[in-house]
Amino acid sequence: ERLNGDIDQMTSMIESVLQYTQSEMKFEQLRQISLQSLIGAIVSDFQDANQPVKFVEQDSLAVSAKTILFNSKPKLFYSKILSAQNVIIYARPLSMQRAITNLIDNALKYGRKANVSLQAESQKASIIIDDYGDSETVENLKQLTAPFKRGKNVKNIKGTGIGLAIVSTIAEQHGGNLTFDRWEEGMRVILSIPR
């Protein structure tokens, strides 16, 4: 009975945190922000704390777009934007900062170090965080976006099981999504936001 009471209390607490996050986002105004600048500032804060985080910056980014100019079949073409600083989105800056910070923090906790990069397409921008962990599967990570879910690799790592739920909520509130993949040395988390 005591265990059920504790679980109910924790569930209530997490629902309150998620409601707070959602209501906070309603009051924070959408603004035009440079993802390059935001990511650079966040990564710099981690580096100032001697954390192994690297922003894999690109001088220019490939941008893909579809066009149907006087043609019955859409064609895919690629063009380069002049500077990665041109990756602008309309977003709630504090919420985006919270989401990116949480993803980097998770990469450090469970994957030893983090590489952050930015990809842009005509309709969306993707913030990619690669870690060097190896014990979670993509399917397990997808399940971790539910509140109070923690992975099998947590061992003695402190956490509440709400971080990815909050990031997922922030992504959805911006019309975006959170996806997971593997890369040759670990896990990849992709936060995609419409442009």
Describe each region flagged by the PLM.
Residues 2-75:
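Conserved DHp (HisKA) dimerization/phosphotransfer helix of two-component histidine kinases, i.e.
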Residues 24-29, 84, 88-91:
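Conserved micro-motifs of the catalytic ATP-binding
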Residues 96-97:
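A residue-level detector for a conserved hydrophobic packing site
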Residues 103, 163, 167:
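Short alpha-helical Gxxx[C/S/T] motif in the catalytic ATP-binding
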Residues 113-123:
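Short beta-strand/loop element within the Bergerat-fold HATPase_c
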Residues 136-148:
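Short conserved segment of the HATPase_c
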